[in-house]
Amino acid sequence: KKSKFWSNDFNVIFIKASDMSVKCDVKETRVHTMAGTAYGELLQDKTFWDDKGNLYVACNTERTDAQSYTEQVGNLLRINKGEFQFDQNYMGHNYSAGKLITSTYMGNNKAVLYIQDPVHTGAAGWGNNYNCWFAILDLATDQRTEVVYNGTHLPYSLGTFAQFAVVRDGKVYFATNPEKEAPGIYIYDIATGNVTKGLSIQEGYSFRRLVPMEREKLPAVL
């Protein structure tokens, strides 16, 4: 049964912050919905800016074979710097499968994606299963590469209402909630592409959100 929440498009309103006036209202019809949750950016990374100031928005669309609202496939849309509409010539993560749960910019024109896809992970189905995995997306070529450690993929994880990737000081930290081993953190070095194993926590516990304990270092403005 099709969910009552589904629509075939969504609107983006551009608002001038200084006086709250509406600049314009834009309808997007290529995808169904932004990849938002109840808490939005307070909990999960759904949008990011690249080094050129372009804004990327994670979006999802109902799969043609969907049996529930959860079963979606994701894309990235882009609003170019200085523009007030989506770039109609750009459709990122242009793949036939993979629901976008979070999207985080890691620099060098690449993004970290946390993706739900039970076929890819071999899980029993959608919903509360170990059906999520990490990939790095090249924003220029749209090449999607799964993150690996010691020659194999990171453990497939349980948890979609969560933030499991954090970028800080040249590294990406990944949290995993595997089915058959202790939850753990893996560390990806952006400069070299090497992945090392960080800490593990006791089985029976699980990660829900990685939160840096200090602000990201930003360049001084002169």
Regions found by a protein language model. Give the residues of each.
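Long, acidic/polar, low-complexity amphipathic helices and coiled-coil-like
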Residues: 1-42, 49
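Blade-level signature of beta-propeller repeat domains, shared across WD40, Kelch, NHL, RCC1
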Residues: 178, 194-222
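Beta-propeller blade signature
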Residues: 2-21, 70-84, 128-141, 185-192
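Long non-transmembrane domains of secretory-pathway and surface proteins
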Residues: 43-57, 61-79, 84-92, 98-102, ...
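Repeated scaffold domains used in trafficking and secretory/extracellular systems
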Residues: 33-47, 94-108, 155-165, 203-216
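Intrinsically disordered, low-complexity segments enriched in Gly and acidic/Ser/Thr residues
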Residues: 87-181
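Short, conserved, GDST-rich strand-edge loop motifs in beta-rich repeat architectures
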Residues: 1-7, 57-73, 113-130, 177-179
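Beta-propeller fold detector
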Residues: 21-32, 81, 85-95, 143-152, ...
